[in-house]
Protein backbone atom coordinates (compact mmCIF):
# COMPACT_ATOMS: atom_id res chain seq x y z
CA UNK A 1 0.00 0.00 0.00
CA UNK A 2 1.32 3.43 -0.96
CA UNK A 3 1.41 6.06 1.80
CA UNK A 4 2.03 9.01 -0.53
CA UNK A 5 0.17 10.03 -3.69
CA UNK A 6 1.93 9.61 -7.04
CA UNK A 7 4.36 12.34 -8.08
CA UNK A 8 2.51 15.53 -9.01
CA UNK A 9 3.39 16.69 -12.53
CA UNK A 10 2.02 19.32 -14.87
CA UNK A 11 -0.53 17.62 -17.19
CA UNK A 12 1.58 18.28 -20.31
CA UNK A 13 4.64 16.71 -18.63
CA UNK A 14 2.72 13.63 -17.49
CA UNK A 15 1.25 13.22 -21.00
CA UNK A 16 4.71 13.58 -22.55
CA UNK A 17 6.13 10.88 -20.28
CA UNK A 18 3.12 8.64 -20.82
CA UNK A 19 3.44 8.85 -24.61
CA UNK A 20 7.11 7.95 -24.26
CA UNK A 21 6.43 4.91 -22.05
CA UNK A 22 3.49 3.82 -24.20
CA UNK A 23 5.40 4.08 -27.49
CA UNK A 24 4.50 1.69 -30.29
CA UNK A 25 7.39 -0.69 -29.59
CA UNK A 26 6.59 -0.84 -25.85
CA UNK A 27 2.91 -1.56 -26.43
CA UNK A 28 3.61 -4.26 -29.02
CA UNK A 29 6.21 -5.88 -26.72
CA UNK A 30 3.57 -6.48 -24.00
CA UNK A 31 0.17 -4.76 -24.20
CA UNK A 32 -1.19 -1.24 -23.79
CA UNK A 33 -2.73 -2.23 -20.46
CA UNK A 34 0.58 -3.57 -19.12
CA UNK A 35 2.51 -0.51 -20.37
CA UNK A 36 -0.03 1.79 -18.66
CA UNK A 37 0.16 -0.20 -15.41
CA UNK A 38 3.95 0.01 -15.41
CA UNK A 39 3.88 3.77 -16.04
CA UNK A 40 1.39 4.45 -13.23
CA UNK A 41 3.43 2.26 -10.87
CA UNK A 42 6.54 4.25 -11.74
CA UNK A 43 4.81 7.56 -10.87
CA UNK A 44 3.81 6.10 -7.50
CA UNK A 45 7.29 4.72 -6.78
CA UNK A 46 8.94 8.08 -7.54
CA UNK A 47 7.18 9.72 -4.58
CA UNK A 48 8.50 7.08 -2.15
CA UNK A 49 12.14 6.64 -1.04
CA UNK A 50 14.30 3.65 -2.07
CA UNK A 51 14.34 0.68 0.31
CA UNK A 52 18.06 0.98 1.04
CA UNK A 53 20.55 3.62 2.04
CA UNK A 54 23.72 3.08 0.02
CA UNK A 55 27.13 4.16 1.26
CA UNK A 56 30.35 3.85 -0.69
CA UNK A 57 33.46 3.07 1.32
CA UNK A 58 36.52 5.19 0.61
CA UNK A 59 38.88 2.26 0.06
CA UNK A 60 41.79 4.70 -0.27
CA UNK A 61 41.75 5.21 3.51
CA UNK A 62 40.22 2.03 4.94
CA UNK A 63 39.16 -1.52 4.18
CA UNK A 64 35.48 -2.27 3.63
CA UNK A 65 35.35 -4.58 6.66
CA UNK A 66 36.99 -2.00 8.95
CA UNK A 67 34.56 0.72 7.84
CA UNK A 68 31.62 -1.69 8.11
CA UNK A 69 32.59 -2.27 11.76
CA UNK A 70 32.74 1.49 12.42
CA UNK A 71 29.35 1.90 10.76
CA UNK A 72 27.77 -0.84 12.89
CA UNK A 73 29.04 0.96 16.01
CA UNK A 74 27.48 4.21 14.78
CA UNK A 75 24.13 2.51 14.07
CA UNK A 76 24.12 1.07 17.58
CA UNK A 77 24.51 4.61 18.96
CA UNK A 78 21.57 5.80 16.84
CA UNK A 79 19.21 2.83 17.23
CA UNK A 80 20.25 1.21 20.52
CA UNK A 81 19.25 -2.45 20.75
CA UNK A 82 17.52 -2.53 17.36
CA UNK A 83 19.64 -4.63 15.03
CA UNK A 84 20.15 -2.91 11.66
CA UNK A 85 22.15 -5.02 9.20
CA UNK A 86 24.94 -3.58 7.05
CA UNK A 87 25.39 -5.71 3.93
CA UNK A 88 28.33 -5.64 1.52
CA UNK A 89 27.21 -5.72 -2.12
CA UNK A 90 28.73 -8.74 -3.91
CA UNK A 91 29.04 -7.05 -7.32
CA UNK A 92 30.04 -3.64 -5.92
CA UNK A 93 32.61 -4.60 -3.27
CA UNK A 94 33.10 -1.04 -1.98
CA UNK A 95 29.36 -0.51 -1.43
CA UNK A 96 27.46 -1.14 1.83
CA UNK A 97 23.67 -1.42 2.01
CA UNK A 98 21.57 -0.38 5.01
CA UNK A 99 17.85 -1.22 4.83
CA UNK A 100 15.26 1.40 5.67
CA UNK A 101 12.29 0.52 7.87
CA UNK A 102 8.83 1.77 7.03
CA UNK A 103 6.44 3.09 6.06
CA UNK A 104 5.21 3.30 9.67
CA UNK A 105 1.49 3.99 9.61
CA UNK A 106 0.51 4.34 13.29
CA UNK A 107 2.33 7.54 14.19
CA UNK A 108 0.08 9.88 16.16
CA UNK A 109 -0.14 13.35 14.62
CA UNK A 110 0.50 16.27 16.97
CA UNK A 111 -1.33 19.56 17.29
CA UNK A 112 1.86 21.56 16.72
CA UNK A 113 3.01 21.57 13.10
CA UNK A 114 6.05 22.55 11.10
CA UNK A 115 5.90 22.87 7.31
CA UNK A 116 9.13 22.24 5.41
CA UNK A 117 10.05 22.79 1.79
CA UNK A 118 9.83 19.88 -0.63
CA UNK A 119 13.60 19.43 -0.88
CA UNK A 120 13.94 19.32 2.91
CA UNK A 121 11.01 16.87 3.05
CA UNK A 122 12.72 14.56 0.57
CA UNK A 123 15.86 14.56 2.74
CA UNK A 124 13.81 13.71 5.86
CA UNK A 125 12.41 10.66 4.06
CA UNK A 126 15.99 9.47 3.59
CA UNK A 127 17.08 9.88 7.20
CA UNK A 128 17.88 13.56 7.69
CA UNK A 129 16.76 15.77 10.55
CA UNK A 130 15.06 19.08 9.72
CA UNK A 131 17.55 21.93 9.43
CA UNK A 132 16.44 25.50 10.06
CA UNK A 133 16.80 26.73 6.44
CA UNK A 134 14.27 24.06 5.36
CA UNK A 135 11.53 25.27 7.73
CA UNK A 136 8.85 27.33 5.96
CA UNK A 137 6.26 27.74 8.72
CA UNK A 138 5.63 26.72 12.33
CA UNK A 139 2.67 26.73 14.70
CA UNK A 140 2.11 29.98 16.58
CA UNK A 141 3.11 28.81 20.06
CA UNK A 142 5.88 26.30 19.19
CA UNK A 143 8.58 26.19 21.86
CA UNK A 144 11.91 24.39 22.09
CA UNK A 145 11.31 20.85 23.35
CA UNK A 146 7.80 20.51 21.87
CA UNK A 147 6.84 17.32 20.03
CA UNK A 148 5.95 18.54 16.55
CA UNK A 149 4.42 16.93 13.46
CA UNK A 150 6.42 17.66 10.30
CA UNK A 151 4.77 18.11 6.89
CA UNK A 152 6.17 18.71 3.42
CA UNK A 153 4.81 21.56 1.29
CA UNK A 154 5.18 19.56 -1.92
CA UNK A 155 3.83 22.29 -4.22
CA UNK A 156 5.74 25.20 -2.67
CA UNK A 157 2.59 27.19 -1.79
CA UNK A 158 3.21 27.91 1.91
CA UNK A 159 4.39 31.43 2.76
CA UNK A 160 7.59 31.78 4.78
CA UNK A 161 6.78 32.44 8.43
CA UNK A 162 3.10 31.44 8.21
CA UNK A 163 1.48 30.28 11.47
CA UNK A 164 -0.79 27.76 9.77
CA UNK A 165 -1.13 26.22 6.32
CA UNK A 166 -4.21 24.57 4.82
CA UNK A 167 -2.78 23.74 1.39
CA UNK A 168 -1.52 20.37 0.13
CA UNK A 169 0.90 18.93 2.67
CA UNK A 170 2.28 15.44 3.25
CA UNK A 171 2.94 14.03 6.74
CA UNK A 172 6.57 12.97 7.27
CA UNK A 173 6.53 12.03 10.96
CA UNK A 174 7.15 13.63 14.35
CA UNK A 175 10.17 15.24 15.95
CA UNK A 176 11.30 17.41 18.84
CA UNK A 177 11.81 21.11 18.23
CA UNK A 178 15.29 22.36 19.06
CA UNK A 179 14.16 25.98 18.77
CA UNK A 180 11.04 28.08 19.32
CA UNK A 181 9.09 29.65 16.47
CA UNK A 182 10.50 33.02 17.57
CA UNK A 183 14.08 31.69 17.37
CA UNK A 184 13.50 30.42 13.84
CA UNK A 185 11.71 33.39 12.28
CA UNK A 186 12.83 36.35 14.40
CA UNK A 187 16.29 35.18 15.33
CA UNK A 188 19.60 35.39 13.51
CA UNK A 189 19.20 35.22 9.71
CA UNK A 190 22.06 32.74 9.26
CA UNK A 191 20.73 30.00 11.57
CA UNK A 192 21.73 26.70 9.94
CA UNK A 193 21.61 23.98 12.60
CA UNK A 194 18.99 21.35 13.36
CA UNK A 195 15.53 22.84 13.87
CA UNK A 196 13.56 19.62 14.41
CA UNK A 197 15.21 16.39 15.53
CA UNK A 198 13.16 13.61 13.94
CA UNK A 199 12.16 10.96 16.49
CA UNK A 200 9.28 9.20 14.68
CA UNK A 201 9.82 9.48 10.93
CA UNK A 202 7.49 7.58 8.60
CA UNK A 203 10.62 6.02 7.08
CA UNK A 204 13.40 5.24 9.55
CA UNK A 205 16.90 5.49 8.14
CA UNK A 206 20.24 6.36 9.77
CA UNK A 207 21.28 9.99 9.91
CA UNK A 208 24.68 10.47 8.28
CA UNK A 209 25.33 14.07 9.29
CA UNK A 210 29.10 14.18 9.91
CA UNK A 211 29.28 10.38 10.30
CA UNK A 212 32.68 8.93 9.26
CA UNK A 213 33.17 11.73 6.68
CA UNK A 214 36.61 10.53 5.55
CA UNK A 215 35.56 6.89 5.23
CA UNK A 216 32.14 6.91 3.56
CA UNK A 217 30.32 8.78 0.82
CA UNK A 218 26.53 8.69 0.55
CA UNK A 219 25.66 7.74 -3.02
CA UNK A 220 22.65 6.21 -4.75
CA UNK A 221 23.35 2.63 -5.82
CA UNK A 222 23.22 3.23 -9.62
CA UNK A 223 25.66 6.14 -9.24
CA UNK A 224 28.19 3.77 -7.65
CA UNK A 225 27.88 1.49 -10.68
CA UNK A 226 29.17 4.19 -13.06
CA UNK A 227 32.83 4.23 -11.94
CA UNK A 228 32.95 0.42 -11.86
CA UNK A 229 31.64 0.32 -15.45
CA UNK A 230 34.28 2.92 -16.42
CA UNK A 231 36.95 0.56 -14.95
CA UNK A 232 39.71 3.17 -14.51
CA UNK A 233 43.29 1.92 -14.21
CA UNK A 234 46.19 3.39 -12.18
CA UNK A 235 48.20 5.94 -14.17
CA UNK A 236 45.43 6.87 -16.60
CA UNK A 237 44.14 10.35 -17.37
CA UNK A 238 40.40 10.56 -16.73
CA UNK A 239 37.88 13.37 -17.33
CA UNK A 240 34.64 13.81 -15.38
CA UNK A 241 32.85 16.44 -17.46
CA UNK A 242 29.99 17.45 -15.13
CA UNK A 243 31.49 16.37 -11.85
CA UNK A 244 29.95 18.13 -8.82
CA UNK A 245 29.51 17.19 -6.02
CA UNK A 246 32.22 14.65 -6.81
CA UNK A 247 30.78 11.23 -6.00
CA UNK A 248 31.88 9.67 -9.30
CA UNK A 249 35.10 11.72 -9.40
CA UNK A 250 36.26 10.55 -5.97
CA UNK A 251 35.09 6.98 -6.66
CA UNK A 252 37.16 6.94 -9.86
CA UNK A 253 40.25 8.23 -8.04
CA UNK A 254 39.85 5.60 -5.31
CA UNK A 255 39.50 2.78 -7.87
CA UNK A 256 42.75 4.02 -9.49
CA UNK A 257 44.44 3.82 -6.06
CA UNK A 258 44.88 7.62 -6.36
CA UNK A 259 47.51 7.03 -9.08
CA UNK A 260 47.05 8.96 -12.30
CA UNK A 261 45.05 12.11 -12.98
CA UNK A 262 41.34 12.77 -12.63
CA UNK A 263 40.22 16.09 -14.11
CA UNK A 264 36.84 17.29 -12.82
CA UNK A 265 34.86 20.10 -14.44
CA UNK A 266 31.78 21.98 -13.30
CA UNK A 267 30.65 25.45 -14.28
CA UNK A 268 29.36 26.52 -10.83
CA UNK A 269 32.14 27.69 -8.52
CA UNK A 270 30.43 26.79 -5.22
CA UNK A 271 29.98 23.22 -6.51
CA UNK A 272 33.63 23.02 -7.57
CA UNK A 273 34.71 24.19 -4.12
CA UNK A 274 32.49 21.51 -2.54
CA UNK A 275 34.07 18.89 -4.82
CA UNK A 276 37.57 19.99 -3.77
CA UNK A 277 36.48 19.83 -0.13
CA UNK A 278 35.16 16.28 -0.61
CA UNK A 279 38.38 15.17 -2.34
CA UNK A 280 40.46 16.62 0.51
CA UNK A 281 38.26 15.00 3.16
CA UNK A 282 38.68 11.62 1.44
CA UNK A 283 42.46 12.05 1.23
CA UNK A 284 42.57 11.92 -2.59
CA UNK A 285 45.37 13.84 -4.33
CA UNK A 286 44.99 12.77 -7.98
CA UNK A 287 41.93 15.01 -8.53
CA UNK A 288 42.21 18.44 -10.16
CA UNK A 289 38.94 20.37 -10.25
CA UNK A 290 38.21 23.39 -12.44
CA UNK A 291 35.31 25.80 -12.70
CA UNK A 292 34.68 25.46 -16.43
CA UNK A 293 31.85 24.89 -18.91
CA UNK A 294 32.41 21.39 -20.32
CA UNK A 295 30.75 22.31 -23.64
CA UNK A 296 33.85 24.49 -24.25
CA UNK A 297 36.43 21.97 -23.00
CA UNK A 298 37.88 21.21 -26.47
CA UNK A 299 40.94 23.33 -27.29
CA UNK A 300 40.52 24.94 -30.71
CA UNK A 301 44.08 26.31 -30.95
CA UNK A 302 47.34 25.96 -29.05
CA UNK A 303 47.22 29.32 -27.29
CA UNK A 304 44.07 29.25 -25.16
CA UNK A 305 43.50 27.54 -21.83
CA UNK A 306 44.74 27.19 -18.26
CA UNK A 307 48.09 25.44 -17.91
CA UNK A 308 47.30 21.78 -17.33
CA UNK A 309 43.60 22.63 -17.29
CA UNK A 310 40.74 23.25 -19.68
CA UNK A 311 40.30 23.53 -22.57
CA UNK A 312 42.14 20.37 -23.66
CA UNK A 313 43.67 19.16 -26.89
CA UNK A 314 41.75 16.50 -28.85
CA UNK A 315 42.21 12.90 -27.74
CA UNK A 316 43.75 13.79 -24.35
CA UNK A 317 41.88 11.32 -22.12
CA UNK A 318 41.94 7.55 -21.61
CA UNK A 319 38.41 7.47 -20.16
CA UNK A 320 35.59 9.99 -19.77
CA UNK A 321 32.52 10.14 -17.53
CA UNK A 322 29.65 12.22 -18.87
CA UNK A 323 27.09 12.20 -16.08
CA UNK A 324 25.05 14.68 -18.05
CA UNK A 325 22.85 17.49 -16.77
CA UNK A 326 19.34 16.07 -17.08
CA UNK A 327 15.71 16.53 -16.09
CA UNK A 328 16.37 14.48 -12.92
CA UNK A 329 13.02 12.72 -13.23
CA UNK A 330 14.41 9.53 -11.68
CA UNK A 331 15.26 11.06 -8.30
CA UNK A 332 13.48 9.59 -5.27
CA UNK A 333 11.64 10.53 -3.24
CA UNK A 334 10.06 13.30 -5.32
CA UNK A 335 6.41 14.09 -4.66
CA UNK A 336 6.08 17.02 -7.05
CA UNK A 337 7.83 18.43 -10.09
CA UNK A 338 6.66 21.90 -11.12
CA UNK A 339 8.73 22.02 -14.31
CA UNK A 340 7.12 22.92 -17.62
CA UNK A 341 7.37 20.62 -20.63
CA UNK A 342 9.83 23.09 -22.16
CA UNK A 343 12.11 22.74 -19.13
CA UNK A 344 11.89 18.93 -19.06
CA UNK A 345 12.75 18.68 -22.77
CA UNK A 346 15.50 21.32 -22.72
CA UNK A 347 18.33 18.94 -21.82
CA UNK A 348 18.62 16.84 -24.98
CA UNK A 349 20.43 19.54 -27.05
CA UNK A 350 22.85 20.28 -24.18
CA UNK A 351 23.62 16.58 -23.73
CA UNK A 352 24.41 16.31 -27.46
CA UNK A 353 26.80 19.28 -27.27
CA UNK A 354 28.58 17.56 -24.40
CA UNK A 355 28.72 14.25 -26.28
CA UNK A 356 30.33 16.02 -29.27
CA UNK A 357 33.06 17.37 -26.98
CA UNK A 358 33.48 14.06 -25.13
CA UNK A 359 34.02 12.05 -28.32
CA UNK A 360 36.71 14.45 -29.55
CA UNK A 361 38.52 14.53 -26.19
CA UNK A 362 38.64 10.72 -25.92
CA UNK A 363 41.68 8.80 -27.15
CA UNK A 364 41.20 6.00 -29.71
CA UNK A 365 40.65 2.84 -27.68
CA UNK A 366 39.25 4.94 -24.84
CA UNK A 367 36.00 4.44 -22.93
CA UNK A 368 33.13 6.91 -22.57
CA UNK A 369 30.44 6.27 -19.95
CA UNK A 370 27.25 8.31 -20.35
CA UNK A 371 24.76 8.41 -17.48
CA UNK A 372 21.68 10.31 -16.29
CA UNK A 373 19.39 10.23 -13.25
CA UNK A 374 16.27 10.52 -15.38
CA UNK A 375 13.67 8.18 -16.87
CA UNK A 376 12.92 9.87 -20.21
CA UNK A 377 13.52 8.04 -23.48
CA UNK A 378 14.75 11.29 -25.09
CA UNK A 379 17.66 11.72 -22.66
CA UNK A 380 18.64 8.05 -22.53
CA UNK A 381 18.06 5.50 -25.30
CA UNK A 382 17.41 8.18 -27.94
CA UNK A 383 20.76 9.76 -27.09
CA UNK A 384 22.50 6.40 -27.52
CA UNK A 385 20.85 5.88 -30.92
CA UNK A 386 21.82 9.44 -31.95
CA UNK A 387 25.43 8.98 -30.78
CA UNK A 388 25.83 5.74 -32.73
CA UNK A 389 24.45 7.43 -35.88
CA UNK A 390 26.52 10.59 -35.45
CA UNK A 391 29.87 9.10 -34.43
CA UNK A 392 30.85 6.05 -36.52
CA UNK A 393 33.93 5.76 -34.28
CA UNK A 394 31.75 4.74 -31.29
CA UNK A 395 30.79 1.17 -30.44
CA UNK A 396 28.33 0.29 -27.68
CA UNK A 397 29.91 -2.03 -25.12
CA UNK A 398 28.57 -4.57 -22.60
CA UNK A 399 28.83 -3.36 -19.00
CA UNK A 400 30.37 -4.96 -15.95
CA UNK A 401 28.79 -5.15 -13.46
CA UNK A 402 25.35 -5.43 -15.08
CA UNK A 403 22.94 -4.68 -12.23
CA UNK A 404 20.16 -2.63 -13.83
CA UNK A 405 17.65 -3.86 -16.38
CA UNK A 406 18.09 -3.55 -20.13
CA UNK A 407 17.24 -0.38 -22.05
CA UNK A 408 13.69 0.66 -22.95
CA UNK A 409 12.33 0.03 -26.43
CA UNK A 410 11.18 2.95 -28.58
CA UNK A 411 14.40 4.57 -29.81
CA UNK A 412 15.08 2.16 -32.67
CA UNK A 413 17.90 0.27 -30.95
CA UNK A 414 18.27 -3.48 -31.54
CA UNK A 415 17.54 -5.98 -28.77
CA UNK A 416 21.27 -6.71 -28.59
CA UNK A 417 22.02 -3.01 -28.10
CA UNK A 418 19.30 -2.67 -25.43
CA UNK A 419 20.92 -5.53 -23.49
CA UNK A 420 24.19 -3.57 -23.39
CA UNK A 421 22.51 -0.65 -21.59
CA UNK A 422 21.51 -0.38 -17.92
CA UNK A 423 18.19 1.22 -17.04
CA UNK A 424 17.30 1.25 -13.35
CA UNK A 425 13.50 1.26 -13.18
CA UNK A 426 11.91 1.29 -9.69
CA UNK A 427 8.51 0.25 -11.09
CA UNK A 428 9.69 -3.36 -11.38
CA UNK A 429 9.38 -4.03 -7.63
CA UNK A 430 6.34 -3.51 -5.37
CA UNK A 431 6.42 -1.07 -2.44
CA UNK A 432 8.17 -2.67 0.52
CA UNK A 433 6.84 -2.60 4.08
CA UNK A 434 9.83 -3.32 6.27
CA UNK A 435 9.85 -3.40 10.07
CA UNK A 436 12.61 -4.43 12.48
CA UNK A 437 11.16 -7.94 12.84
CA UNK A 438 11.12 -8.58 9.09
CA UNK A 439 14.65 -7.12 8.86
CA UNK A 440 15.87 -9.73 11.31
CA UNK A 441 14.36 -12.49 9.16
CA UNK A 442 15.43 -11.07 5.77
CA UNK A 443 17.95 -13.09 3.79
CA UNK A 444 21.09 -11.35 2.53
CA UNK A 445 20.30 -12.33 -1.08
CA UNK A 446 16.83 -10.80 -0.83
CA UNK A 447 18.21 -7.51 0.49
CA UNK A 448 20.75 -7.33 -2.35
CA UNK A 449 18.06 -8.09 -4.95
CA UNK A 450 15.87 -5.36 -3.43
CA UNK A 451 18.72 -2.83 -3.41
CA UNK A 452 19.36 -3.49 -7.11
CA UNK A 453 15.70 -2.95 -8.04
CA UNK A 454 14.23 -0.46 -5.56
CA UNK A 455 16.55 2.47 -6.23
CA UNK A 456 16.37 5.76 -8.10
CA UNK A 457 15.59 5.88 -11.82
CA UNK A 458 18.94 5.92 -13.64
CA UNK A 459 20.56 5.12 -16.99
CA UNK A 460 24.07 4.05 -18.06
CA UNK A 461 25.62 3.50 -21.51
CA UNK A 462 29.23 2.52 -22.21
CA UNK A 463 30.98 3.34 -25.50
CA UNK A 464 34.38 2.38 -26.93
CA UNK A 465 36.08 4.79 -29.35
CA UNK A 466 37.45 2.61 -32.14
CA UNK A 467 39.26 5.17 -34.29
CA UNK A 468 40.69 8.67 -34.22
CA UNK A 469 38.52 11.75 -34.73
CA UNK A 470 41.38 14.22 -35.22
CA UNK A 471 39.56 15.32 -38.38
CA UNK A 472 36.73 17.63 -37.25
CA UNK A 473 33.47 15.92 -36.23
CA UNK A 474 30.51 17.56 -38.02
CA UNK A 475 27.84 19.19 -35.85
CA UNK A 476 24.48 17.51 -36.54
Curated annotation (Swiss-Prot):
Database matches in PROSITE patterns: PUA, SAM_MT_RSMB_NOP
GO CC annotation: cytoplasm
Domain of life: Eukaryota
Annotated CDD domains: AdoMet_MTases (cd02440), PUA_NSun6-like (cd21150)
Residues carrying N6-acetyllysine: 419
All residue ranges annotated as the PUA domain in the record: 111-203
EC numbers: 2.1.1.-
Major subcellular site: cytoplasm
An example Gene Ontology molecular-function term: tRNA binding
Compartments, as annotated in UniProt: Cytoplasm
Reactions it catalyzes: cytidine(72) in tRNA(Thr) + S-adenosyl-L-methionine = 5-methylcytidine(72) in tRNA(Thr) + S-adenosyl-L-homocysteine + H(+); cytidine(72) in tRNA(Cys) + S-adenosyl-L-methionine = 5-methylcytidine(72) in tRNA(Cys) + S-adenosyl-L-homocysteine + H(+)
A GO biological-process term: tRNA methylation
SUPFAM superfamilies: PUA domain-like (SSF88697), S-adenosyl-L-methionine-dependent methyltransferases (SSF53335)
Binding site for S-adenosyl-L-methionine: 242-248, 266, 293, 323
Catalytic center residues: 373 (nucleophile)
UniProt keyword terms in alphabetical order: Acetylation, Cytoplasm, Methyltransferase, RNA-binding, S-adenosyl-L-methionine, Transferase
Entry comment, domain topic: The PUA domain plays a role in tRNA recognition through precisely recognizing the CCA end and the D-stem region of tRNA.
PANTHER family assigned to the protein according to its UniProt record, in alphabetical order: NOP2 YEAST -RELATED NOL1/NOP2/FMU SUN DOMAIN-CONTAINING (PTHR22807), TRNA (CYTOSINE(72)-C(5))-METHYLTRANSFERASE NSUN6 (PTHR22807:SF34)
Family classification: Belongs to the class I-like SAM-binding methyltransferase superfamily. RsmB/NOP family.
Purpose: S-adenosyl-L-methionine-dependent methyltransferase that specifically methylates the C5 position of cytosine 72 in tRNA(Thr)(TGT) and tRNA(Cys)(GCA). In vitro also methylates tRNA(Thr)(AGT). Methylation requires, in the acceptor stem region, the presence of the 3'-CCA terminus, the target site C72, the discriminator base U73, and the second and third base pairs (2:71 and 3:70) in the tRNA substrates.
UniProt-recorded name of the protein: tRNA (cytosine(72)-C(5))-methyltransferase NSUN6
